[in-house]
């Protein structure tokens, strides 16, 4: 398994020729396409969101406005994860379909990727649930066939997460899965398509108002 923080031209060539590549982007910067390399730029618009272990409290818009008015950091605003606990990637990392405490170090070091520009029927291995205001499709772990190779993207700094037993267990489980014959992504994508999707600005949702229609 080739482990990379950037998809350099050398890594891309190995991938397209049949290598298994684990891509671990380490910041929440936007990914920009440059020639045959996917790199990260601090000057580009971030198309990721922050990592948040606990469900965002109560009303994202209200607390977002309060934070902005007080020049405070706004919560990432996400609502936990959604995954298939029977997926072979979890053989060494037991999980439910939702967030639980073993996920804390992984999510704490994460920056989920906005997948709005990808195929509507594509589902990441680990999806992050967004709040109703943004309603982005967010991915923590994604996989594709690329050329003759196989690519797995994890939007968590697993080296930092590995300071904790849970983080190490997840990292080892990911690598064990990738080294096995069970690593066989159903979805396919070309490098050109991947570059284009990552470079496109995601859709923007504009809600005029949120109404409480309950009887409480």
PLM regions and their residue ranges:
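Soluble or luminal CAZymes and related metallo-dependent hydrolases
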Residues: 3, 134, 166, 170
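Surface-exposed beta-strand edges and their flanking turn/coil or helix-capping segments
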Residues: 16-17, 36-37, 104, 141, ...
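Short alpha-beta junction capping motif
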Residues: 2-52, 56-59, 145-155, 174-177
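Catalytic beta-strand/loop cores that center a nucleophilic Ser/Cys/Thr
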Residues: 30, 55-165, 182-216
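Short, charged/polar low-complexity linear motifs in solvent-exposed/disordered segments
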Residues: 40-41, 108, 169-172
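Short amphipathic C-terminal alpha-helix that caps PH/PH-like domains
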Residues: 167-179
């Amino acid at each position: 398994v080739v482990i990379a923080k950037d998809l350099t031209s050398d890594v891309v060539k190995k991938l397209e020729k049949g290598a298994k590549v684990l891509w671990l982007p380490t910041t929440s910067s936007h990914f920009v396409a440059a020639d045959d390399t996917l790199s990260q730029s601090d000057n580009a618009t971030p198309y990721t969101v922050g990592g948040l272990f606990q469900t965002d409290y109560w009303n994202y818009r209200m607390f977002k406005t309060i934070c902005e008015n007080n020049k405070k950091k706004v919560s990432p605003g996400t609502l936990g994860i959604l995954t298939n606990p029977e997926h072979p990637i979890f053989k060494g990392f037991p999980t439910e379909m939702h967030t639980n405490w073993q996920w804390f170090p992984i999510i704490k070091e994460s920056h989920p990727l906005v997948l709005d520009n990808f195929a509507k029927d594509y589902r990441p291995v680990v999806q992050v649930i967004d709040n109703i205001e943004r309603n982005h499709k967010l991915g923590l772990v994604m996989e594709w066939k690329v050329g003759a190779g196989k690519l797995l993207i994890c939007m968590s700094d697993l080296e930092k997460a590995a300071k904790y037993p849970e983080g190490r267990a997840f990292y080892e489980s990911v690598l064990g899965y990738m080294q096995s014959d069970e690593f066989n992504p159903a979805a396919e994508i070309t490098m050109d398509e991947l570059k284009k999707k990552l470079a496109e600005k995601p859709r923007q949702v504009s809600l005029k108002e949120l109404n409480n229609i309950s009887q409480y």
